[in-house]
Amino acid sequence: MARMRVRFPTLVLLLGILFLMAVSIGIAYGEKDVIKNHERPGEREHEERDPRQQPRPRKQEEQEREHRREEEHDRDPSRGRRESEERQEEERERRREPCREREQEQQPQHGRREEEEEEEEWQPRRLRPQSRKEEREQEQGSSSSSRKQSGYERRQYHERREQRDEKEKEQDSRSDSRRQRNPYHFSSERFQTRYRNRNGQIRVLERFDQRTNRLENLQNYRIVEFQSNPNTLILPKHSDADYILVVLNGRATITIVNPDKRQAYNLEYGDALRVPAGTTSYILNPDDNQNLRVVKLAIPINNPSNFYDFYPSSTKDQQSYFSGFSKNTLEATFNTRYEEIQRILLGNEDEQEDEEQRRGQEQSYQDEGVIVRVSKEQIQELRKHAQSSSRKGKPSESGPFNLRSNESIYSNKFGNFYEITPERNPQVQDLDISLTFTEINEGALLLPHYNSKAIFIVVVDEGEGNYELVGIRDQQRQQDEQEEEEEEVRRYSARLSEGDIFVIPAGYPISVNASSNLRLLGFGINANENQRNFLAGSEDNVISQLDREVKELTFPGSAQDVERLIKNQQQSYFANAQPQQKQQREKEGRRGRRSLISSILSTLY
């Protein structure tokens, strides 16, 4: 009995120890399960949920989840704070979703595309949409460094976006500033279409004085371009402007109609002709394959910078000038009833015409316009009595003349320069206009020069290149309520392509560089007694004509250095666009590469 008394407390003590151990182990396993539940809530819920069991209401699940969070908060307050922050973030995301959906529905399609590109750019790792649970796992698993990294990526994206926007703005401003900085260059896009149909078009360049007041003296001069397909005719018309036309592509037959006679001329590439104001004329393209391109310098008579064409026929593009007269005037003029005049000259406007007549008119309506197609028989009749231009000898007072009929005034292996001055041609004498035609070979340079009096309007006929024009820009500054002008030397440059126009003001030095064979047509305004002064070259160089003492006083270098520098260029008027030193370096580089290759081959073989 006494022995059992001794063993009983020992047994109780052992049982107590076992109980405490069991409790400790249970607590440890419970904490581990809680951590697992916290890390993988989706998997835990999936394991606990019986597939045969009916799904519980969403409200009940939220209550149970809230209860578990409170228990975890009691065990670990910091973890509870994180959970509350996550809940707040989740609630904010849930509130943002409807707004985003509404914005996506309201914004246009291209805006959505840009937004998707932006999202892909600053979130490159996010390849597919994620569920809310996956996002929570990603947020819970990420450390503070990953949050900093995502913020850094976002900042990087915004910086890249700002740089891209600034670059686009800079490019736009550059293009705008180019147009503003160089008012002397007009691309082919600056033409305005007056008439167009499937047979051709007539375009007019914008006014020269719209860009700068320095070209006010050109407000009464316009450039017109006429293009037509093979076997077409521009209908008869007269204009309140004098024309000087030049054929730049194809062949043409132009007919000049006067009250007492009619004269037809065959024109080819480079032929020019003056058409006086008020003269009725029409132009035929007799070629079967080649398009016709004619450029005209128009000099308005009635209104500076504006001129109008008057057609005797009515088309979809232009009304007949006969339609402007009253019925009584027309009947008295032709001594015929108005209905007959309308049928013959103006066209039938009867609204009661039948279906067949309407269909026939609709079919012919497609061919109506100021440029129409002609048959082979009609072409032969129109060209039967036509004369050709004079290639050699003295130009006629009314017939066409070719710009390259005489020898070029400047010529070498790099180019040719032809000119017809008012003194040499009676057709342009009273207009005080000269015509030039320049051929610059690929890789050649028309040396810097300037014109003493003439303002030249230059049309790029063929090829590509660039030019540099040196002018003076006035800068006005107001100091002490007095306006002062500062003169600054300015370079105006532009790329040249076919159809472009550029202006060379009098006194402005210019040089032209040809990246391919370049052909230029020039109209010189105020050309009488104009003198062309070259600034470099072995001949006609005004700098070389300066006295030695003046050279000494004018330039930083000595007169001897200036003369030696001028003599370095042995060509005149046209020269190689690449400096001789650069060519020598390129030759030495090619020679070195060849020697290196030969040494490598000799080593191998």
Curated annotation (Swiss-Prot):
Residues 37-105, 150-179 have a biased composition (Basic and acidic residues). Residues 140-149 have a biased composition (Low complexity). CDD domains: cupin_7S_vicilin-like_C, cupin_7S_vicilin-like_N. It comes from the Eukaryota. It holds the Pfam family Cupin_1. Disulfide bonds: none annotated. The keyword Transferase does not apply. GO terms for molecular function: nutrient reservoir activity. Keywords: Allergen, Glycoprotein, Seed storage protein, Signal, Storage protein. Glycans are attached at N406, N513. Residues 37-193, 346-367, 382-405, 574-593 are annotated as: Disordered. Residues 1-30 form the signal peptide. Residues 184-342, 401-563 form the Cupin type-1 domain. PANTHER family: OS03G0336100 PROTEIN-RELATED, VICILIN C72. Belongs to the 7S seed storage protein family. Component of globulins complexes which accumulate in seeds. The variability of the residues taking part of IgE-binding epitopes might be responsible of the difference in cross-reactivity among legumes. Seed storage protein. Accumulates during seed development and is hydrolyzed after germination to provide a carbon and nitrogen source for the developing seedling. This is Conglutin beta 7.
